[in-house]
Amino acid sequence: MHMEKLRVIISGGGTGGHIFPAISIANALKEEKPNAEILFVGAKGRMEMEKVPAAGYKIIGIPARGLKRPLYSPSNIGVAIDYLRCKCQAKKIIKEFKPNLVVGVGGYASAAIVSVAAKMGIPVLLQEQNSYAGIVNKKNGKNADKICVAYDNMERFFPKDKIILTGNPIRKDIAKATQQQKEEGYKFYNLDPNKQTIFVVGGSLGCRTLNE
């Protein structure tokens, strides 16, 4: 029996918190189905345009931008125009690539692709990395078939019947640290292995509160 090749578009980005889970998803898909074709769609000029090709995947950039605060800012007129351009490009990308599935990982780059894919009847999966859902994923929740989350109580943001508690995708080089590597880490950072360590980071774009 002939099996149709899996073709997946993964869209999102803007920050490492979106990009690296997306790459982990792609790696897992390729491991499960080596013949799968995967295409990334990200925002032009953002870090995904560098990180995704470095991981060995093709990416197409679209002119996606996030809304400015306050929302009545005049610059948001340009954001709205760019979003319409993104939707036109998204339709063209989907028609040419013919995906079996579209995965949205959040970030403004995923807004147009997920919206257009849902309207074209293509299955949509969202992946939300945070305990407080991002604006784009919250909006796209109504268009998704399933939503993979990392935390409990996400019914606050998404329809309960669509939620699957999966945890966050983790890169293998992080998840599979050897005991020797762990011991070296404890020693390097002068940590007590018998105590829990809390690691606080501000994200790939930095954090003003922490920096100050």
Where are these regions (language model features)?
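Short amphipathic alpha-helix
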Residues: H18-L29
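Glycine-rich phosphate-binding loop signature in dinucleotide/nucleotide-binding domains
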Residues: K33, I93-K98, L191-P193
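Glycosyltransferases and closely related glycan-assembly transferases
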Residues: Q89-V102, A109-L125, K138-K146
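Donor-nucleotide binding loops and adjacent catalytic segments primarily
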Residues: M47, K51-A55, K176-K187, L191-E212
